[in-house]
Swiss-Prot record:
Reaction catalyzed: (2E)-4-hydroxy-3-methylbut-2-enyl diphosphate + oxidized [flavodoxin] + H2O + 2 H(+) = 2-C-methyl-D-erythritol 2,4-cyclic diphosphate + reduced [flavodoxin]
Pathway terms, separated by semicolons: Isoprenoid biosynthesis; isopentenyl diphosphate biosynthesis via DXP pathway; isopentenyl diphosphate from 1-deoxy-D-xylulose 5-phosphate: step 5/6
Keyword Iron: yes
Name of protein: 4-hydroxy-3-methylbut-2-en-1-yl diphosphate synthase (flavodoxin)
Enzyme class (EC, first level): oxidoreductase
Pfam families: GcpE (PF04551)
Keywords: 4Fe-4S, Iron, Iron-sulfur, Isoprene biosynthesis, Metal-binding, Oxidoreductase
Function: Converts 2C-methyl-D-erythritol 2,4-cyclodiphosphate (ME-2,4cPP) into 1-hydroxy-2-methyl-2-(E)-butenyl 4-diphosphate.
Length: 391
């Protein structure tokens, strides 16, 4: 807002710099296979298979799908002997590092290490007599050169901790994790990552804040039992956004009661939204209102489906009227403002052509490819429009 002379109108508020993320918290560095975890490396995205681990083909197929979706590290359950027996084949054939998830039976920790898994996650709250086995675990992991994640969950805290605190408070989660880490350190083993998960994002965030202040271990962020896709996405986004913006967090796993590929999509978008991961194709669209002269929802879905396979850093805007067109979407690389059966196609805020509504999606595809080529961006073979749109 300005005066008739062009001078800005002051509102009595001090000028404030644009908000920036806090620097990454300095941690020790770990290698999970070929993926670095710690403050010297980008924040990685993990998921967990939902197959029966002993079904090697099904598990490897799902790992391949996760890899194609951008998963950096994958975790597999190991509840039974048949699952432990499948680990060598899975670890050998997986295109990304495999972490074995161990509960209840300590013998499976050694099976996972012998199988060539890139790391092991242990839950000290439910592994039988775990404290007494730490020395053996530390030696085996140290000899194999792999890290251990101490994964503390609110639902399975050690009995001693529950007796002290009465419930899974942030302090209880942190004390449990650091106690176990201390046992490993006493054995000369320090390649440790920690997670302190709770299904309440507020408690989870506070637990990680306390843990970050008291240690230099790399932290695996997660909201346990987050729920169905929508609810879990909200919980994880709120919690991860809060922590990552403070520089806390080195690897993340979005837990959803959904296809694990969706976990990767959400995790990737969280990191992209915080500029912690190189942006890919981003579709922005207006929420629609009474001015809209086109079905914005359907058009946005069609554009998203058509461009989904293009792994290029372009922001494409879909606007329902000329009011929200090039002006409000001026930061977009490419976009459309629709009205009266037509679409104004704009590139970086400038209208370049007007096309019939039936040609909007096709034109956006053409312009996206042109922009990518002009920027010297490589479009992966097979990328680009994945569906054919007809109106």
């Amino acid at each position: 807002m300005s005066t008739p002379t062009g001078q800005p109108i002051g509102l009595g508020l001090p000028d404030a710099p644009l908000p920036v993320l806090a620097p990454r918290r300095k941690t020790r560095q770990l290698m999970v296979g070929n993926v670095g975890v710690g403050s010297d490396y980008p924040v990685s995205v993990q998921s967990m298979t939902t197959t029966k681990t002993h079904d090697v083909n099904a598990t490897l197929q799902q790992i391949a799908q996760l890899t194609a979706s951008g998963c950096d590290i994958v975790r597999v359950a190991c509840p039974k002997t048949v699952d432990a027996e499948a680990l060598p084949a899975i670890a050998k054939k997986s295109p990304i590092p495999v972490i074995a998830d161990i509960h209840f039976q300590p013998k499976y920790i050694f099976s996972a290490i012998d199988a060539g898994c890139a790391a092991v996650r242990v839950n000290p709250g439910n592994i039988k007599e775990f404290d007494g086995r730490v020395k053996e675990v530390a030696k085996a992991a140290g000899d194999a050169g792999i890290p251990i994640r101490i994964g503390v969950n609110a639902g399975s805290l050690d009995k001693r901790i529950m007796e002290k605190y009465g419930k899974a408070t942030p302090e209880a989660l942190v004390e449990s994790a650091l106690w176990e880490a201390g046992l490993f350190e006493d054995c000369g083993f320090g390649d440790i990552a920690i997670s302190v998960k709770h299904n309440d994002p507020v408690i989870m965030v506070e637990a990680y804040r306390q843990l970050a202040a008291q240690s230099d271990y790399p932290l695996h962020l997660g909201v346990t039992e987050a729920g169905p896709a929508f609810q879990g996405t909200i919980k994880s986004s709120v919690a991860f956004g809060s922590l990552l913006s403070q520089g806390i967090g080195d690897t993340i796993r979005v837990s959803l009661s959904a296809d694990p590929v969706e976990e990767i999509k959400v995790g990737d978008q969280i990191l992209q939204s915080l500029n912690l991961r190189k942006r890919g194709l981003e579709i922005v669209s207006c929420p629609s209102c009474g001015r809209a002269q086109v079905d914005v929802y359907s058009l946005a879905e069609e554009v998203t489906a058509a461009l989904d396979g293009m792994s290029i850093p372009l922001r494409v805007a879909v606007m329902g009227c000329v009011v929200n067109g090039p002006g409000e979407a001026r930061d977009a690389d490419l976009g459309v403002a629709s009205g009266n059966g037509k679409g104004q196609i704009f590139v970086r805020g400038e209208v370049i052509k007007t096309v019939p509504e039936s040609q909007i999606v096709e034109t956006l595809i053409e312009e996206a490819v042109r922009l990518a080529e002009a920027e010297g961006l490589e479009i992966e073979e097979g990328a680009g429009p994945q569906v054919k749109i007809t109106r």
